[in-house]
Amino acid sequence: MKPLFLLSFAVLFTVGQAQDADPKQRARSVRDLAKQGEDAIPRLAPSLSDPDIGVRVEAVKALVEIGGPKTLDSLVRAAADNDPEIQIRATDGLVNVYLPGYVKTGLSGRLSRVGSTVTSKFTDTNDQAIDPFVQVRPEVIVALGKLARGGASLDARANAARALGVLRGRDAIPDLIEALRSKDDKLMYESLVAVQKIGDPSAAPRISFLLRDLDEKIQVEALETTGLLRNQEAAPQVRDALSHARTIKVRRAALAALGMIADPADHAIFIQNLSEKDDLIRAAAAEGLGRLKNPADRAVVSPMFTNERGMNPRLSAAFALVSLGELNTDRYGPLQYLLNGLNQRSWRGVASPFLIELAREEPIRQSIYAMLGMATKDEKIQLSIVLSRSGDRDSLPALETLSKDPDADVAAEGIRSLRTLRARLP
């Protein structure tokens, strides 16, 4: 009887604190509740409706600190608040449930508030995304979509757009497209990156109006997204952007986009740009030839692979040669050169996407399987990811072997990649 009495007293004491007339005391009570962990989640809910913004902010911070799936309902509710700081913190908290640690690098970690004015600072790093097998609750995507479309501030909207990209929120694409018409560079950029991460080709035609945007950063991102989504219909607009490029960055992005679209009509453009002085222009031209898959172009690309000194264009030439059918696995061949790139942190981000694209073809996967036995630790880890993204049923034995590798890091990635691949397969 005594323990029950003490519990009832504790609950009444907490409720009494929450009803305190002093907002500072109510905020203090919320912070104390957060220390109780998941059990405090239902008791924090009333504070999300507190008339004082400071108390509501503390309630959201407490939910984010507690974390875990049980906070989702309350965080979705908090995302509907009309205060930008609360919206930003709720957004980061929602993402953090699915990508633990996100809140440490999210926008809420760089917020400052003076009265009703909330200032924040976005980082340029935006390369995070959940694993494809992670299932996000629909109401989370709906809540973030509403924020991207009409949050309380442009920062809150941009932060929600970034979150949708991290969570691969396909159902919120209409909200992201609406955000692209905001005329705010930050929001437009984050929305483009999100569309790119989601990777739905049906969204591509709806971003074409940005291919001639006057802001270089927006135009470059629109060109990159158009290429990655393989929007064939936009090829004339991309060619126009290439011929009227105001900067080298726009020119690179336009040629790279044409290289990804891979229209045979652009063959002469690729040949012409193979001899350009700029490394990235030569690289994009080689990639375009690789994707056109004209066997005769091996004679053009092969000398480039042999003689090229720039790392970027040489990796691109290696990609092109493998795409054109050069599948030998010797130590000086193009496929091994791409694998070598996986060992270097500075070039892994170039070599890995090439291999992910190439591994969609079964003959190339067979060559990769043959090379796994002699692969380094980094190569095994990265090739696990490649096969998880582009493999088929024939990749299961290779990933099962990697999941049992003596190296713990290799085995861990093998298990994770095996799970990703199985989730992808019909």
Regions from the PLM with identified roles:
Residues T123, D127, K146, S153-N159, ...:
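Solenoidal tandem-repeat scaffolds enriched in leucines and small polar residues
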Residues T14-E58, A62:
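N-terminal segments that cap or nucleate solenoid repeat domains
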Residues S403, D407-P426:
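Eukaryotic acidic, Ser/Thr-rich intrinsically disordered low-complexity regions
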Residues P23-K24, E38, I53-G54, P69, ...:
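Alpha-helix N-cap/helix-start positions at coil->helix boundaries
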Residues L33-G37, L63, G67, L94, ...:
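Alpha-solenoid repeat junctions
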Residues P3-L12:
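Sec-dependent N-terminal signal peptides
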Residues V11-Q17, G37-S49, G68-A80, P100-T119, ...:
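Amphipathic alpha-helical scaffolding segments comprising HEAT/armadillo-like alpha-solenoid repeats
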